[in-house]
């Protein structure tokens, strides 16, 4: 298992909106990796990192983030699930959009457009 202490230290230097923006970016990357059929071990590592980001942001006390973390951990425990790829792709994109919205950063409008496009594809 990797030592995430340095990564945590770096992640926690940013303010809460920026951390949520970084989390949203990682969730978007997960969605894209699943769609592109990136190596399963890489997807699992990314899910582990995302779960850590969510845990480290526990000080934000956002129940939604906790629920998302549980969902990501369930996916990670059972990955790869070939029949679940499209579902994880969509869920990660939805989570990314919601986390970006929670962050208050202006970029959430772009993520919203991307989500709407993917729902019609």
Residue ranges of model-derived segments:
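Surface-exposed peri-terminal alpha-helical interaction modules
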Residues: 1-121
